[in-house]
């Protein structure tokens, strides 16, 4: 009675581990790129705190521009997609 339950749990663990390994291999090979939305943090990610304080990437007051952009992260680097 206990053996079928243990074998099912073991099967689920193996399948989950293999799925994660395959996704990681595809990502590292460049065949699959997971996209992560970045909302409002693009200036911070690209220029750091000093860039935000000096107004880099923003208006004269140092804030972000009023232009509505979409940001995605590709291989860990933020990319701008203009709408």
Swiss-Prot record:
UniProt keyword annotation of Secreted present: yes
Organism of origin: Caenorhabditis elegans
Domain of life according to the entry: Eukaryota
The protein, known as: FMRFamide-like neuropeptide 23
Residues annotated with Phenylalanine amide modification: 47
Gene name of the encoded protein: flp-23
Keyword Cell membrane: no
Primary localisation category: secreted
Record keywords, A-Z: Amidation, Neuropeptide, Secreted, Signal
GO BP: neuropeptide signaling pathway
One GO cellular component term noted in the UniProt record for this chain: extracellular region
Cellular localization per UniProt: Secreted
Family: Belongs to the FARP (FMRFamide related peptide) family.
Signal peptide: 1-24
Function: FMRFamides and FMRFamide-like peptides are neuropeptides.
